Amino acid sequence: MRPNFLVIMTDQERYPPPYESEAVAAFRRTLAGHERLRDGGAHGAVELHRHYAASTACVPSRTSLFTGHYPSLHGAAQTDGLAKSAGDPRVSWLDPSTVPTMGDWFRAAGYRTEYRGKWHISHADLFATGTHESLRTVDRKGTVDAVAVDAYRRTSRLEPWGFAGWIGREPHGAYLGDTGLVRDPLFAQQADELFADLRDEERPWLSVISLVNPHDIAFSTLQDNFGFPVPDDAVPEVDAAPSQADALDDRPQVQQQFHDVWPQMLIPQPTDATYRRFYYWLHALADRAITTVLDALDAHGHGDDTIVVFTSDHGEMLGAHGGLQQKWYQAYDESIHVPFVVRGPGIAPAPAGVDIATSHVDVLPTLLGLAGIDETIAATVVGEDHVEVHPLVGRDLSALLRGETTVDAVDAPVYFMADDDISRGDRQRNLLTGEPYEAVAGPARVESVLARIASGPGGAPELWKLTRYFTELGEDGDWPEEWELHNLARDPEERTNLAAHPGSDPVPELHQMQAVLDLTRDRKRLTPRFTPRG
């Protein structure tokens, strides 16, 4: 009998950084939902400690996770909001007839597939007739509009992307009713209702519960207006990242530019103690919803036959690396290193977890493997109504999770790419004041590779990260590419760029990692079969 699957996602939750204090670590251990995910209960649980987003920010990351491919293939490379509306010509959403989603793959194998919560892969909102105004289901106070909810249920807006049951609108933007504070408890309630309905389901099922927080960090300066000040005793003091004091003048130039333009795009948000404590309090808010979801899963009798997967779409800089915020224009661990836990029947207990680098593009092939779904056979089915069905570029880690193979047998380089230029669009004006601002210039595209190479004592393997900043041919300006190279084993905070030492010979690992990047890019950065002809 095939297992059920529950995918729980948060938004903007980073993996704990190496400089986290014991007080903050102790606070995180009080988050009951997160602890239950890692514990596994009556079954095994595995935490993959070096898991990375495949892209940033929200739209490209989520689309990569749910398709198993990179933006170079699925095309959803830009995040709407701020400079871009959903209809901006620079924004390309996932077309439902091109690259199939996780829902499509599992439906092809006979699964029932459901989605609740933040989607942000296509613009799936219902609209008031004759307007561009999305149909809201919740007001600022959290009061639910039952008629609007019914409209979303009847129209099942995610059916073309392989999922049923989604209730909009998308929780995205600076409206209080779209914050995690308001929406996450409602998404947890929707999960409870879904699990009750699934008790009579004869088919195996895959359900996604996608939460908003800690994404509300984007509105930290508005927290009093929105009604969620941090309780005095809820979160300990959170120290600044050591790299917050670093200068940006020797970093890739796009970082200094984004550091300067971000306050002009939304609202100045000082990277102070209040800001940092607010971010961790948002973890606690998300954890309440996770706890409700897990309680409901058990209460409705699904706990023993459901594999639970937990991750986040991307992380948050929180002032690290010279005061950077959010997740754009770089590939530092604060931004792309995220939690990833798998627990449930058939998962071998691994109290110490797994330390090889893994990626969001590994998730889909791994879940197919855990379900016993043959990718080749399923590809034939999804290929009947999708024109861009390609072999999945990620690894199937199911044998590792079942304890049937070793980490060395599945270790491989991890690729990351980001073309998301959040500062550029048709409405380059401050979201609150309307004041115009200039978009960042220079090499704003980013690609990165993580790989273990034999650089340690006695040839021991060490994890390295190489990041390239570049522009594409035909883009504005003639900008030279820029590089960052970090030995994560010896420099886990990424403060010493081994690729930038003018006047001296480059370290030998630079050329090694550049070769790894070229090879990994060729294997994983696929492009569509169907492209415009000149």
Where do the PLM segments sit?
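Active-site-proximal N-terminal segment of extracellular/periplasmic enzymes that hydrolyze or transfer
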Residues: M1-V46, E493-S504
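Short, structured active-site-proximal loop/turn typified by the sulfatase FGly-forming signature C/S-X-P-X-R
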Residues: Y19-T63, G68-L73, R112-T113, L510, ...
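Catalytic-site neighborhoods of secreted/periplasmic enzymes
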Residues: H43, T67-P185, D197, F219-L222
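Core domains of carbohydrate- and sulfate-ester-processing enzymes
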Residues: S61-R62, A109, H123-E170, H215-Q269, ...
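C-terminal, low-complexity/hydrophilic appendages and adjacent surface loops
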Residues: I121, Y332-D333, M417-A499
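Catalytic-adjacent loop/helix segments of enzymes that bind and process anionic phosphate/sulfate esters
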Residues: T155-P214, P270-T271, Y275-W281, L285
